[in-house]
């Protein structure tokens, strides 16, 4: 397991919110960040601080995407027609790692990235090991036959802490999902409030 995966709950602690809605999140037990200085009272954030926090929260939710990669996704959202914030969410939710996670084939976004990297996932019948692969509406995502009985997968499909969103059709009996459509921001079931408009403001400074 990578340092990034083992530190997944540190993202919750750093941000101060249970961004995935998981029962074991440390912020369910305390309201301060990690480290020896975590208990210090936070002052009021500046506009920049609020925007930065919104960006870090959104980046964190999708597996703590690197700044370089996240900025690249944002720049594509800007180039597309329509609202940049809506485009940003649509691009993030179209990633293969997000769809495997949303389909409840794995328990966490970090597990999704590792699962894809290890070659357990097919897209339209072909093995795909690129976690950032962008799916299109109509694409069929399937757990490979040799991987369907992995305990990680079987346990994830039984999780009650989240549901499969309606822009994905998941068949857990066949370990297969179809990406129905690119969602609007209002369709995406985040456990905490996300503010893509503030992310746009951050990069527009």
Swiss-Prot record:
What NCBIfam families is this protein classified in? Answer: PRK05327.1, rpsD_bact
Report the PANTHER family cross-referenced here.
Answer: 30S 40S RIBOSOMAL PROTEIN, SMALL RIBOSOMAL SUBUNIT PROTEIN US4M
> What is the name attached to this protein's record?
Small ribosomal subunit protein uS4
Q: How would you summarize the oligomeric state and partners of this protein?
A: Part of the 30S ribosomal subunit. Contacts protein S5. The interaction surface between S4 and S5 is involved in control of translational fidelity.
Which gene is transcribed and translated to give this protein? rpsD
- Note the PROSITE patterns from the entry: RIBOSOMAL_S4, S4
Single GO biological process annotation from the record:
ribosomal small subunit biogenesis
Gene Ontology cellular-component annotations: small ribosomal subunit
The keyword Transferase is annotated on this UniProt entry = no
